[in-house]
Amino acid sequence: MESDQSKVESDQSKMESDQSKVESDQSISQSTSKKRSQYSLRLEAKQRLRFNYGVTERQLLKYVCIAKKARGSTGQVLLQLLEMRLDNIIFRLGLSPTIPGARQLVNHRHILVNDQIVDIPSYRCKPNDIITVRDHQKSQELIKRNIKLAKIDEIPSHLNISYLEETKPKGFINKIVDRGSIGLEINELLVVEYYSRQA
């Protein structure tokens, strides 16, 4: 009888041990799943931001590093840096239907900033900068076509545009863009966290 009782207790102890192991495995699995889920959210936010502004991995990392050193919210500064790129400003002004198209305008020297040709798409614009089109027939024909394609309904509040003629737009930067004027629905802090955890 004692031997049978001992066997029952041994089996019960083994079952409890197995149950404990299963619970432990489930806990580890849930923890891993949660970590993976958080990582995938950060990765998705980073990819969306890259796609939206058409920047490379290296460029985005550089902007994150600059934003971390600046005063204010790192996420907000990051968005401001991306929004104030020349190619993005041209797109927001409605001078190109896409950011890649705006980048091409800059690369091909069709755009002037404060009456100087700028051929660097990542050029950081600042308040009071004036964006115009080169006084060249090809440049003006491109802009005329782009304006028809872009069909911008509303210019963001940090920008302004006027037309001396249909082919001679004049863009003006009123101020640094604020978060409310950025139409992108994204949690920029997830992007900052993504790069913080990669370091």
From Swiss-Prot:
Subcellular compartments = Plastid, Chloroplast
* Ranges of compositional bias, category Basic and acidic residues: 1-24
Q: Ranges for the S4 RNA-binding domain?
A: 84-146
Top-level lineage group:
Eukaryota
Q: Give the main localization category.
A: plastid
This entry's Gene Ontology molecular function terms read: rRNA binding; structural constituent of ribosome
Enumerate the CDD domains for this protein. Answer: S4
Matching InterPro entries: Ribosomal_uS4 (IPR022801), Ribosomal_uS4_bac-type (IPR005709), Ribosomal_uS4_CS (IPR018079), Ribosomal_uS4_N (IPR001912), S4_RNA-bd (IPR002942), S4_RNA-bd_sf (IPR036986)
Is Phosphoprotein found in the keyword set? no
Keywords in alphabetical order: Chloroplast, Plastid, Ribonucleoprotein, Ribosomal protein, RNA-binding, rRNA-binding
Region ranges (Disordered): 1-35
Q: Which Pfam families match?
A: Ribosomal_S4, S4
Q: Which GO terms describe its cellular component?
A: chloroplast; small ribosomal subunit
GO biological process terms, alphabetically, are: ribosomal small subunit biogenesis; translation
Gene3D superfamilies, sorted: Ribosomal Protein S4 Delta 41, Chain A, domain 1, RNA-binding S4 domain
PANTHER family in the cross-refs: 30S 40S RIBOSOMAL PROTEIN, SMALL RIBOSOMAL SUBUNIT PROTEIN US4M
Function, please? One of the primary rRNA binding proteins, it binds directly to 16S rRNA where it nucleates assembly of the body of the 30S subunit.
- Kindly give the HAMAP family that the UniProt entry links to this protein: Ribosomal_uS4_B
The entry sums up its family as follows: Belongs to the universal ribosomal protein uS4 family.
> Subunit structure, briefly?
Part of the 30S ribosomal subunit. Contacts protein S5. The interaction surface between S4 and S5 is involved in control of translational fidelity.
Protein name per the record: Small ribosomal subunit protein uS4c
Q: Which species does this protein come from?
A: Psilotum nudum
Supply the gene name. rps4
